[in-house]
Amino acid sequence: MDVQMQYKEGLGTKGQTQPTLLSSLRSVLFVIGTVVIGFAAFCNSLTWHLQRFWGSSADFWQAQWDKILDTIGDDPITLYVYGSLVLTFVVYWLFGGIYTLLDVTNRPAALRRYKIQPGTNEPVDNKELIKVIVQVVFNQIVVGLPIIYLSHFLMEWRGYPPVRELPTFHWVLAEIAVHILFEEIGFYYSHRLLHSRYLYKYIHKQHHQWTAPIAVTALYCHPLEHIGSNLIPPFLGVFIVGSHVATAWIWFSLAILSTLNAHSGYHLPFFPSPEAHDFHHLK
């Protein structure tokens, strides 16, 4: 009798345990499922609203693009070569100039708290800054222009998309994702190669002269490094997917803003942290 009661109690205990485990499992699955569905709904809603904005204003953007083409023409060399050169030059020095103004004047003082290496370049040495500017402009124009011409001929060989028709918003996002992927791969391996003993000593060491970099030192490097690490990797995705020139311009601008931030020496609020790259320059 006692054995039967113990057995029944054991069943009772087991019976109580099983629902508890099952209910816990169901709770976990419910939470995970809710998070996944919520995240998917958020992403879908976000892209829907962005697509709605893009779609509702598609005629506006297309009209502006037509005005640009009517003004400067739709010749591929004019757009892809000189248009890309001017755009990247302006974006680099406009936003890089803002960072440089902070480093030269040490103002506003409130931003000094975000300096990654306090006490360095406060203010920046003017002679060293001029040296950087001269080298960067040389890289952008003397080195960059022939490479842009070469990339134009490669795109022409591949086949340009219709220049008059802007791509859809979703297609732009998809292409930029591809651009980021191939740029990351290209830059990683080219940069790793530059840290080999021979290439570092004769090529990459110039870029590391700034152990506490400032924004405009992003393109301060040996011309061969500029070609292999700064020009070719961002172009890989553009060539692979055959991007529209407008998409390429958006991507080039984003890439420039990213590298300016990475070399800025500031970890500003809401900006991606450049600390890893900043301390990498100390090596």
Protein language model annotation of sequence segments:
Residues 1-189, 193, 197, 202, ...:
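Non-catalytic, topology-defining segments of multipass membrane proteins
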Residues 195, 201-208, 275-282:
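Short amphipathic alpha-helical coupling elements at transmembrane boundaries
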